């Protein structure tokens, strides 16, 4: 199965972490088979061309293979949840912009650790300096012309 997840990479442990409910599809599947693969990508600029099939895209992507396990240690789970806050809300301060996770909250969720067995990555570098280059986000939501 495939399911989108927010993640953090912990350089200290060379592992990826996710969190989810402590029941449901993810929980059931990893207990049946902990072998997983994970993918992440980042899209950059689009470079136009005269022919539609000649357009280019700047990107970076990675596919990771490994085993997923549930983090059992409460201190480690709370540390990982703080990594999520540091990554996704770096502009907020703990105890000012939000209250950090506490042990009681762990009863309703699971923190998962993906130990990396291997990975494969790919990228295509382009430049916003190329003629006509643009970012998709800049055009999202604009009406499209049909001729």
Residue ranges and their predicted role:
Residues 72-147:
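C-terminal edge-of-domain segments
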Residues 11, 42, 70, 116-118:
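Non-catalytic surface loops within mature trypsin-like serine protease
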Residues 2-4, 50, 125-127:
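Short, glycine/acidic-enriched capping/hinge loops at junctions between secondary-structure elements
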